[in-house]
């Protein structure tokens, strides 16, 4: 059995749905929310690579590198904000994020 485009798109859709469920079920822990958003971006990247391979075009794979770069910067900024929140409030709950207003 060979892996077709439908297999990769189904896996990408399952990963995307899992991340959406993770976002809706967990509203308090910001680290889990950040991981769910990253999983969502990886699901989108998988679809880009699958379509790029299926169509024989490299543009989708190049676009994935740009998305991964932005996702890495987003993760670094998000984790820096979480460290700041933990230092100030000793918790990483989403409700405490409003108290960082200066």
UniProtKB/Swiss-Prot annotation:
It catalyses: a quinone + NADH + 5 H(+)(in) = a quinol + NAD(+) + 4 H(+)(out). One of its GO terms (molecular function) is NADH:ubiquinone reductase (non-electrogenic) activity. GO terms for biological process: ATP synthesis coupled electron transport. NDH-1 is composed of 14 different subunits. Subunits NuoA, H, J, K, L, M, N constitute the membrane sector of the complex. Gene3D superfamilies: 1.10.287.3510. One of its GO terms (cellular component) is NADH dehydrogenase complex. Belongs to the complex I subunit 4L family. NDH-1 shuttles electrons from NADH, via FMN and iron-sulfur (Fe-S) centers, to quinones in the respiratory chain. The immediate electron acceptor for the enzyme in this species is believed to be ubiquinone. Couples the redox reaction to proton translocation (for every two electrons transferred, four hydrogen ions are translocated across the cytoplasmic membrane), and thus conserves the redox energy in a proton gradient. The keyword Endoplasmic reticulum does not apply. It is found in: Cell inner membrane. Its EC number is 7.1.1.-. This is NADH-quinone oxidoreductase subunit K. It is a multi-pass membrane protein. Pfam families: Oxidored_q2.
